[in-house]
Amino acid sequence: MSVRVSGKHMEIGDSFRVRIGEQIEQAVTKYFDGGYSSQVTVEKSGSRFSADCKLHLDTGVVLQANGQANEPQSAFDAASERIEKRLRRYKRKLKDHHNGNGQNSTEVAYRVMDSVPFEDEEVPDDYAPTIVAETTKQLRTMSVANAVMALDMTDEPVLMFRSPGKDDLNIVYRRNDGNIGWIDAANIKA
């Protein structure tokens, strides 16, 4: 039940720190009765402020949200509203009893790389894409509906998962038009 608050390019006052902690605690206890830890970062960039909020629940679920505004308090309020909305969806998901609590999960490597150049671009001989981040994530077994719900609870652009029964790899992702796309590897012909 810890809330860590930090500021980038700005100082966070004690009253704002207390307000953030109380608001996070209020949102979590409203929808979830387990333990949690949270990291809130408020950043000033130019004349705007952004607040990034990451919430780790005891069930292993990680919820992320961010907000932007002209005032740091307003930016945090926007992020807090999004976190509360995701907590509400998570509670509804738990009530539906569709989640298998991740007991059918596999650990996989997760890499984020720089974009590959197009075929008509000049590519130097020593070109190698830069790996921006490399972590290990759990590859869970879940239905497409649960995968869309899990994608909706985070700000991640892509979620890879295994389909139940067949063990095929599937991907759900956010499309540029705002909709969710689904790639079923079983339907891809080589």
Swiss-Prot record:
Gene Ontology BP terms: negative regulation of translational elongation
Main location: cytoplasm
GO cellular component term of the entry, any: cytosolic small ribosomal subunit
Keywords recorded for this protein, A-Z: Cytoplasm, Translation regulation
Transmembrane segment boundaries: none
GO MF annotations, alphabetized: ribosomal small subunit binding
Subcellular location: Cytoplasm
Domain of life, per lineage: Bacteria
Cytoplasm keyword on record: yes
Family (UniProt): Belongs to the HPF/YfiA ribosome-associated protein family. Long HPF subfamily.
HAMAP family assigned to the protein according to its UniProt record, in alphabetical order: HPF
The protein's assembly and partners: Interacts with 100S ribosomes.
Function statement: Required for dimerization of active 70S ribosomes into 100S ribosomes in stationary phase; 100S ribosomes are translationally inactive and sometimes present during exponential growth.
Name under which the protein is recorded: Ribosome hibernation promotion factor
Record organism: Rhizobium meliloti (strain 1021)
